[in-house]
């Protein structure tokens, strides 16, 4: 086992604080509407330019191992805030730096670290309750656009696009961010349920100009099996032909004789048919077939429940207003399923999301909810160069996370004002002893740090602005973009409650651990092995 380097007490804390400051100082220059960019070198390709706190934090590794431990612990704050709310990473870092700096000063002055931590935790718990009380629900499109705009660093077009996407696919809908092809940002919305399976034969195409199959008011046959024998399909085909409507077959697979017969029928115009494979694999395929059945008021023909394809009737078939199939995707628009049944199915899937243990499962279940509840929107980010594209895409993703958080837990006044109001409401809070009271004061002072940093990044005097904001009440604050005072909510400067809450909780959690650190252990650097000496008589 390698020998260790051990540092105690003040020696350890000073080193740790130095690492915290290096990382936090690099991250906090990005805070606020007038925050600056940070350029990150890459081992290959062009450097990345970003204003995203967590991206900056992830890049920082320090040479001194003790300093690096301090930096890595603050990096954890940014990562946790990012995972929980998708935004607020810079705010969390600024809060953590302030709590650690003030807390370590108090420890150096002889306070008990454990009592300090208890005081900080008490203040943060009270602050979180006050934040919830200040929170206003965020439901209308205008508020969503404002949250998106603030989170995308005052880029109004991004805020509007996100609000429009949420309008179209609902709060539950899936919104994804992709690279665009032009200079402008675009929004593509797929209404209805879309899954990534295309037609099984190009002979089904009835719209050659678009290379797609379009079926109006079709019957939809859902089968959880491979279909290779046409005899199984004949009764359904005859019934559908009599009804004079097209038919879409969604099955595990349609092959051989069955597929050939369907193609011949379509080409001769006897009955309009198209066949696609069911989406997903294994149990997920069964679940998705059931989703489609709920959406179209059909029944999945499955041998597991004793149903045979030959005995299927028109009552077992689902229906939709329209189906569009191309090479890679199938979209079912306006299924005739009952709203109550669809909501029931959505509730059932939500329950599974609660119980899901892996992120992958959770994501797939969320997609299924979206497909049942609304649709899918794709924001295509436009930019002139690849470097700008990466930077902008990161901002749009941040803004999207922020708006989701706002819809979930509501919004509070932005620009660091909410934390100042919360701090003013809990100034009377008392701990069990004097050291805990100092811990409470440390947390209250930290709650001013985000506002001070936003003002500092504008080139103004933080103390003057902080005192002016403190002298007001409610949503009165400082608009750093226009350098005016006023009602933050009226000016459209909103922060999602979840983002502010997560930033405060994670910052206090990690800062509390660092304040109570008394010893740090790391590997001693290995001495380089001496070079092999030249062999005798071989000198130059």
UniProtKB/Swiss-Prot annotation:
The keyword Zinc-finger is assigned to this record: no
Transmembrane feature ranges: none
Gene giving rise to this polypeptide: groEL
InterPro entries attached to this UniProt entry: Chaperonin_Cpn60_CS, Cpn60/GroEL, Cpn60/GroEL/TCP-1, GroEL-like_apical_dom_sf, GROEL-like_equatorial_sf, TCP-1-like_intermed_sf
GO molecular function: ATP binding; ATP-dependent protein folding chaperone; isomerase activity
Keyword annotations: ATP-binding, Chaperone, Cytoplasm, Isomerase, Nucleotide-binding
Domain of life the protein comes from: Bacteria
Binding-site positions, ATP: 30-33, 51, 87-91, 415, 479-481, 495
Cross-referenced PROSITE patterns: CHAPERONINS_CPN60 (PS00296)
Protein name listed in UniProt: Chaperonin GroEL
Major localization listed first in the record, in broad terms: cytoplasm
Subcellular locations according to the entry: Cytoplasm
Pfam families given in the database record: Cpn60_TCP1
Subunit field text: Forms a cylinder of 14 subunits composed of two heptameric rings stacked back-to-back. Interacts with the co-chaperonin GroES.
Protein purpose: Together with its co-chaperonin GroES, plays an essential role in assisting protein folding. The GroEL-GroES system forms a nano-cage that allows encapsulation of the non-native substrate proteins and provides a physical environment optimized to promote and accelerate protein folding.
NCBIfam families (UniProt xref): GroEL, PRK00013.1, PRK12849.1, PRK12850.1, PRK12851.1
Leader sequence segment: none
């Amino acid at each position: 086992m390698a020998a260790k380097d051990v540092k105690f007490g003040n020696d350890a804390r000073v080193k740790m604080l130095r690492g915290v400051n290096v990382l936090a100082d690099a991250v906090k220059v990005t805070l606020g509407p007038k925050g600056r960019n940070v350029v990150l070198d890459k081992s290959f390709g062009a450097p990345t330019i970003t204003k995203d706190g967590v991206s900056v934090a992830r890049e920082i590794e320090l040479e001194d191992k003790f300093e690096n431990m301090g930096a890595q612990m603050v990096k954890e704050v940014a990562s946790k805030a990012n995972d929980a709310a998708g935004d607020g990473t810079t705010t969390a870092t600024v809060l953590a730096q302030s709590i650690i700096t003030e807390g370590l000063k108090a420890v150096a002055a002889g306070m008990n670290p454990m009592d300090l931590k208890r005081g900080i935790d008490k203040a943060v718990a009270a602050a979180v309750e006050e934040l919830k009380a200040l929170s206003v629900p965020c439901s209308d499109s205008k508020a969503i656009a404002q949250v998106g705009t603030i989170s995308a660093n005052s880029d109004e077009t991004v805020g509007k696009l996100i609000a429009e996407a949420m309008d179209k696919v609902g709060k539950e809908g899936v919104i994804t961010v992709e690279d665009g092809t032009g200079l402008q940002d675009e929004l593509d919305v797929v209404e209805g349920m879309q899954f990534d399976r295309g037609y099984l034969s190009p002979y089904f195409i009835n719209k050659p100009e678009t290379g797609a199959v379009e079926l109006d008011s079709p019957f939809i046959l859902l089968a959880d099996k491979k279909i290779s024998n046409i005899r199984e399909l004949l009764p359904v085909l005859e019934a559908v032909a009599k009804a004079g409507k097209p038919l879409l077959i969604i099955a595990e697979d349609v092959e051989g004789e069955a597929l050939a017969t369907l193609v011949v029928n379509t080409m001769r115009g006897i009955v309009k048919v198209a066949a696609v494979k069911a989406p997903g694999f294994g149990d997920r395929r069964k679940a998705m077939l059931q989703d489609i059945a709920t959406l179209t008021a059909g029944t999945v023909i499955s041998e597991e429940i004793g149903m045979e394809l030959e005995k299927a009737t028109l009552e077992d078939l689902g229906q939709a207003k329209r189906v569009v199939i191309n090479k890679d995707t199938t979209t079912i628009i306006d299924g005739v399923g009952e709203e109550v049944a669809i909501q029931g199915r959505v509730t059932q899937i939500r329950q599974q999301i609660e119980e899901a243990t892996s992120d992958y499962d959770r994501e797939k279940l969320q997609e299924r909810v979206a497909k049942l509840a609304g649709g899918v929107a794709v924001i295509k980010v436009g930019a002139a160069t690849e470097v700008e594209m990466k930077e902008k895409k990161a901002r749009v993703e941040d803004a999207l996370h922020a708006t989701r958080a706002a819809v979930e837990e509501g919004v509070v006044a932005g620009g660091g004002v909410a934390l100042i109001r919360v701090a003013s409401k809990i100034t009377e809070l008392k701990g069990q002893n004097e050291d805990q009271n100092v811990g409470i004061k440390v947390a209250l002072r930290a709650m001013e740090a985000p506002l001070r940093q936003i003002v500092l990044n504008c080139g103004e005097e933080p103390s003057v602005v902080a005192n002016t904001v403190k002298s007001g009440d409610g949503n009165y604050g400082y608009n750093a973009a226009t350098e005016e005072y006023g009602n933050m909510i009226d000016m459209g400067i909103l922060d999602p409650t979840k983002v502010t809450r997560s930033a405060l909780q994670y910052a206090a959690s990690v800062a509390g651990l660092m304040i109570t650190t008394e010893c740090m252990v790391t590997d001693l650097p290995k001495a380089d092995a001496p070079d092999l000496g030249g062999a005798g008589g071989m000198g130059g």
